[in-house]
Design a protein with these regions (language model features):
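Intrinsically disordered, low-complexity proline/glycine-rich segments
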Residues: 1-210
C-alpha cells in the first residue's frame, strides 16, 4: 500500500498551489486557478513527469442519472475521462450525493462521509475499494492537506485526480481573500447506505498502519 500526501503550499484570491509527496519526496505539483464570477477552476499538474489537467466541461449533459459540475480529464491535450457529482436515490426519502468518474473505460466512485468532526472519503473501482482519503477538519489559513492511502500502484493517479476534484467542489473559493484564520468543520451523515461505504479496518487490512 502507498501513502501519498497532497500538501497545499499557498492560497491566493484566485489560485491555490499544492505539492504531491511520497516519503517526503516531491513527485508532482498542482496549480489551481479560478476567475471572477465563477465557482469553477482549472487544475493543471504534473505527476511523475505526466502532465494533466481538469477542466470544467460545458457540454450538454444527457443520460438517466443527473450530472453536476462535470470536469474533463485531459492528458497530452487528449480527453481521457470525466469526473462529476451525482445523486444516488434509493427511494423518495433516502438519497445521497457522491462523485463519479469514467477514466480509460473504467468506472470509479468517491463517497465522502462525515462522522461529526471527521471526514473520510472512500474510493471504489467496480464496487471494490481501492483507496481512502483522510484529512483534518481543522483548517489553518485556508490551507488544506490530504493523505491518500492507496492499495495498488495502478490506482495512484486516478485517486489523486479525484482528490483534486473534491478540493475544487468542496473547499476552493475563488475571489475570497485569504486571512489568518482557523476554521473547524463539523457535519454528521445519517444515511446508512452512504455510511456503509466506509470500512474502518480497510487501511490496516491492506497492510499500512497510520
Amino acid at each position: 500500500m502507498k501513502k501519498i500526501l497532497l500538501k497545499q503550499k499557498s492560497k491566493e484570491i484566485y489560485s491555490a498551489e499544492f505539492e504531491i509527496l511520497e516519503n517526503d519526496s516531491v513527485i508532482g505539483q498542482v496549480f489551481i486557478k479560478g476567475k471572477l464570477g465563477s465557482m469553477e477552476a482549472i487544475v493543471d499538474g504534473t505527476f511523475h513527469n505526466k502532465n494533466f489537467s481538469l477542466k470544467f466541461s460545458n457540454k450538454i449533459l444527457t443520460g438517466s442519472s443527473k450530472k453536476f459540475r462535470p470536469y474533463n480529464i485531459i492528458e497530452n491535450e487528449n480527453i481521457t475521462g470525466e469526473i462529476f457529482q451525482t445523486v444516488f436515490r434509493k427511494n423518495l426519502f433516502s438519497k445521497y450525493e457522491y462523485i463519479k468518474c469514467n477514466y480509460n473505460e473504467e468506472k470509479f466512485k468517491l463517497y465522502s462521509i462525515w462522522f461529526g468532526d471527521k471526514q473520510v472519503c472512500a474510493i471504489y473501482k467496480n464496487d471494490i475499494q481501492i483507496s481512502q482519503i483522510e484529512f483534518s477538519n481543522v483548517i489553518y489559513n485556508d490551507l488544506h492537506d490530504y493523505t491518500i492511502y492507496i492499495k495498488d500502484d495502478d490506482n495512484i493517479f486516478i485517486s489523486i485526480l479525484l482528490n483534486y476534484y473534491l478540493y475544487v467542489v468542496e473547499k476552493f473559493k475563488p475571489g475570497v481573500k485569504v486571512t489568518k484564520s482557523v476554521v473547524k468543520y463539523y457535519q454528521k451523515d445519517s444515511n446508512k447506505d452512504l455510511i456503509s461505504k466506509y470500512n474502518s479496518d480497510w487501511i490496516s487490512k491492506c497492510g499500512l498502519n497510520e
